[in-house]
């Protein structure tokens, strides 16, 4: 037995689409052992839903506007579609560069995304940035993205947008790995940078 052909047909235009927009923690990773939540996301949906992952490694909210990634999504978005957005890891670099921060530019850029999605009839959903895996001397998860997680939560509340606290969920996950055993926790991220 062998596969002799594969046919790929476009989904009907009416098929609901969930767009993903974010950084390396939700983009399609090209080589193992790197992985992201975004590339695992489609397995939770029936074939009647399209998952379109537009996340890109190294991206920020600002980049998704400047590099026209958001525009690309909006060009095909239809009423009833969703956009799930998760940034923060690379946005932190704007603090050192003195070009932004969580409660200033980050929140302003979130609002631009929300306004654009709503103008196209889509439904936005904000996710707080997943935490990096790191522990203090007492074995507690180090909170490296707390300001960005809080800024995302505040934005969702103020703009009346659905919100998933991925930061809190990922901290619980890392704590559970560490509780099983520090060695097990390290092996889960073997050869990794504690983010991917």
Predicted features and spans:
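Serine-esterase "nucleophile elbow" of acetyl-processing enzymes
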Residues: 1-56, 70-83
């Amino acid at each position: 037995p062998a596969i002799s052909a594969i046919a790929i047909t476009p989904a009907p235009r009416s098929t609901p689409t969930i767009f993903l927009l974010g950084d390396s923690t939700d983009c399609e990773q090209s080589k193992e052992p790197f992985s992201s939540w975004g590339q695992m996301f489609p397995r939770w949906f029936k074939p009647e839903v399209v998952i379109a992952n537009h996340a890109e490694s190294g991206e920020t909210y600002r980049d998704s506007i400047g590099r026209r990634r958001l525009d690309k999504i909006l060009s095909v978005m239809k009423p009833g579609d969703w956009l799930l957005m998760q940034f923060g890891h690379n946005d932190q670099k704007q603090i050192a560069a003195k070009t932004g921060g969580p409660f200033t530019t980050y929140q302003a850029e979130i609002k631009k995304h929300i306004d654009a999605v709503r103008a196209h009839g889509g439904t936005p959903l904000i996710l707080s940035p997943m935490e990096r895996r790191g522990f203090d001397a007492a074995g507690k998860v180090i909170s490296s993205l707390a300001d960005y997680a809080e800024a995302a939560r505040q934005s969702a509340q103020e703009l009346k947008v659905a919100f998933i606290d991925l930061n809190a969920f990922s901290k619980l996950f890392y704590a559970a790995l560490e509780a099983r055993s520090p060695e097990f926790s390290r092996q889960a991220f073997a050869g990794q940078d504690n983010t991917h």
